[in-house]
Structures are given as C-alpha cells and as structure tokens.
Amino acid sequence: MSNVPAELKYSKEHEWLRKEADGTYTVGITEHAQELLGDMVFVDLPEVGATVEAGADCAVAESVKAASDIYAPISGEIVAVNEELNDSPELVNSDPYSDGWIFKIKASDEAQVAALLDATAYEALLEDE
C-alpha cells in the first residue's frame, strides 16, 4: 500500500495538497501516482503567475513509461514552481511529498480545498482501483 500522509488533502487524479504557513498550497503527485508512472525523466512545470482552474491540466510529468498531465486540485494563481525538478526530476520518485513537490498555488476559492479527499477517502479510492 502506498504511503498516504494524514495531514494532506488529495484529488481523485492523484495530486496532493498541503497548506503552508503563508496561506499558499504546495501541490505534487502522490506516491501511488509516481509508482504507476515509473522513473521520471522530465517535469514540464507551469508558469509562475498563471491562473488555473480546478481540474485543469497545468503541468506534465514525463517518465520512462508515459507522459501524464498534472491537474490543479484547486483554482488559483501559480506562485512558485520547483526549479529543482529541471535538473532532478527523479525527486518526484524519491520524495513525492517533500522535495518532489511540483508547484505552489494561491487559492482563489478556499471552499475547493474542503471538497478534496482526506487521507482516509484517498486510501479507499486506491483500494477501489
């Protein structure tokens, strides 16, 4: 079973979301998603300053197996991207919940966060797959 940290929120598309002290949210893909994709070779990051809608594709993770869209779990403005992934995309594999984060977003609608899955609901989703 994949590691599913209890303090995070999750999307059905296997992105995770963590609220930061400054009120922004850090987003990445889950351990389950990176296991399915395999070894990352490139991450196409979103543009800082871009406004995205919840559910819209905003980045791409390319692995040795496939290229997979990464979706914004909430609407808002991209305020930072993980530049480390340009040289070390494998961080998504080795540390998906920390050093392998993909972007940070400033929410335009906090209510969307509450609508995401908690760890228990995400684990149930994984069991159904």
From Swiss-Prot:
Chain ranges of the Lipoyl-binding domain: 24-106
Keywords assigned: Lipoyl
N6-lipoyllysine sites (modified residues): K65
Any one GO CC term of the record: glycine cleavage complex
Note accompanying the cofactor annotation: Binds 1 lipoyl cofactor covalently.
One Pfam family linked to the record: GCV_H
Residues spanning the signal sequence: none
GO biological process, one term: glycine decarboxylation via glycine cleavage system
Gene3D superfamilies: 2.40.50.100
SUPFAM superfamilies given in the database record: Single hybrid motif
InterPro entries named in the record: 2-oxoA_DH_lipoyl-BS, Biotin_lipoyl, GCV_H, GCV_H/Fam206, GCV_H_sub, Single_hybrid_motif
Family: Belongs to the GcvH family.
Assembly and oligomerization: The glycine cleavage system is composed of four proteins: P, T, L and H.
HAMAP family: GcvH
Function noted in UniProt: The glycine cleavage system catalyzes the degradation of glycine. The H protein shuttles the methylamine group of glycine from the P protein to the T protein.
The protein, known as: Glycine cleavage system H protein
Species this chain originates from: Klebsiella pneumoniae (strain 342)
